[in-house]
Amino acid sequence: GNKHSLVNDQVHDVMEDSDGDLWFATSNGSSLYQTDTKEWHSFFSSFDPIPDDKNHIFLTLCEVSPGVIWAGGFTSDICRIEKKKGFNISYLSPTTIAGVRPDQYIYDIKKDSNGDIWSGGYYHLKRINFENKSVRLYPGVTSITTIQEKDTRQMWIGTRMGLYQLDKESGIYQYVDLPIESPYICALYQRDDGILYIGTRGAGLLVYDINKKKFIHQYRTENCALISDNIYTILPRQDGSLLMGTENGITIYSPKAHSFRNWTREQGLMSINFNAGSATTYSKNALVFGGNDGAVRFPTDIEIPEPHYSRLLLRDFMIAYHPVYPGDDGSPLEKDIDETDRLKLTYGQNSFSLDVASINYDYPSNILYSWKIDGFHKEWSRPSQDNRIIVRNLPPGNYTLQIRAISNEEKYKTYETRNIQIIITPP
């Protein structure tokens, strides 16, 4: 809580204002970083002179007019900071104006193209006219997580139970039918050509065609190289790709190639667990993500390093679940299994196993293994991180065991294939 840093390391939202300064909503107040002077200021924290009964946990920030910042969090009041008036602080209570019960919290505040301010929380969605401070309530949807303008007439409203399209005038909500039951919406990004990217908690990245009103794709850890099914933030980059924050690191998604490139703690990324909605572009050439360890700044054109790979290693050869070593009595191994390219086994040794591994590798979770025995299996095994090969009751004959190391990020890229000739003698 000093004047030289963030007031608190748990960053729930981050925003660049019209002066190019950065604001942070944290678990103990809000922080401002002034880009020119490199000075920090904090507001509403336990270190600041504010009434004890006031909330310190902030979840969202919005610049409602130049130099006027609204902050929302675990209270139904909105806190207002006026930068140009010596950081004058005041409180606004939209629920009181609207004559409804106080909200448990305010999760998102957004300004639309008409200049109206939208505030979404546990109970209510409200539209606040900034000029006359009148409030319109939009009943019908609760547990709001994220608000995004669709166009001048409509809004996207993300909730813990799914996504809605709201008509601003009629107040009618339309539920967007997504291919998963009650998705928890964390992040929304709408492209100019009518493609909506939906980041969820637990269901990966969903892609929706607004014009055709149909869902195009669902990316999950099980069908692509995504490192997490929790997509907390989505930021566009100049080249058309998207930079996304998860609880396992960041991932760059290329819509053209339908590919993902990941940067994780394994590869030296510092803060790992990013928070939902906590990201912004900053000074045109940087992206700032907030997480459980403060905030991390990346250049917009960051290139995630190409994964480095070295060779495939074979080890831990066993027959009938007993370890076997070269030179042992009755052992089929003349040298270590990693140096063996031909294995002659008796009929009684036709159930065996071995492990595969990749050495000197900076990103182990990107390696998947697949194998098959030519002459016995028709198909390769499904690529997975399971590195144990188990063969049971292989009939007498001549075979080739083939083992592949495959990239999880680029499913069609085989790093290496190893072969062992296997002979099972008749009884």
Describe the function of each predicted region.
Residues 16-19, 63-66, 111-114, 148-153, ...:
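Residue-level detector of Asp-centered blade-edge/turn motifs that repeat once per structural unit
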Residues 34-38, 82-86, 129-133, 167-171, ...:
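Short loop/turn segments that connect beta-strands within beta-propeller blades
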Residues 123, 145, 161-164, 183-189, ...:
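Beta-propeller domains
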Residues 105-108, 121:
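Solenoidal tandem-repeat scaffolds enriched in leucines and small polar residues
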Residues 28-31, 74-78, 122-126, 160-164, ...:
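Loop/turn residues immediately N-terminal
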Residues 21-24, 68-71, 116-119, 154-157, ...:
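Conserved beta-propeller blade signature
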Residues 1-12, 48-58, 98-102, 140-143, ...:
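Residue-level "micro-hotspots" composed of small/polar
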